[in-house]
Amino acid sequence: MAKKEDTIVLEGRVKELLPGMHFKILLENGMPVTAHLCGKMRMSNIRLLVGDRVTVEMSAYDLTKARVVYRHR
């Protein structure tokens, strides 16, 4: 399991909604990633729409997948 030091925190925008609470996110650096909601966002019933600005955490070992940890207002 990745340690907290191994995560990369970036910001991006939701570009596409995928089945199973997955999303296509376009990061600020132009890189597209596939992301899912973190557990606390699922439990709080926080929904994302296309165009929402989000903060994602990525593992340093797989830069194609991410976890959405915050939706900006």
From Swiss-Prot:
SUPFAM superfamilies (UniProt xref): Nucleic acid-binding proteins
An example Gene Ontology molecular-function term: translation initiation factor activity
Compartment(s): Cytoplasm
Heme found in the keyword field: no
Principal place of residence: cytoplasm
Highest rank taxon of the organism: Bacteria
Domain S1-like: from-to ranges: 1-73
Single GO cellular component term: cytosol
Transmembrane intervals: none
Record keywords: Cytoplasm, Initiation factor, Protein biosynthesis, RNA-binding, rRNA-binding
RNA-binding listed as a keyword: yes
Role: One of the essential components for the initiation of protein synthesis. Stabilizes the binding of IF-2 and IF-3 on the 30S subunit to which N-formylmethionyl-tRNA(fMet) subsequently binds. Helps modulate mRNA selection, yielding the 30S pre-initiation complex (PIC). Upon addition of the 50S ribosomal subunit IF-1, IF-2 and IF-3 are released leaving the mature 70S translation initiation complex.
Protein family membership: Belongs to the IF-1 family.
Subunit field text: Component of the 30S ribosomal translation pre-initiation complex which assembles on the 30S ribosome in the order IF-2 and IF-3, IF-1 and N-formylmethionyl-tRNA(fMet); mRNA recruitment can occur at any time during PIC assembly.
Protein name: Translation initiation factor IF-1
Protein source organism: Chlamydia abortus (strain DSM 27085 / S26/3) (Chlamydophila abortus)
Origin organism lineage: Bacteria, Pseudomonadati, Chlamydiota, Chlamydiia, Chlamydiales
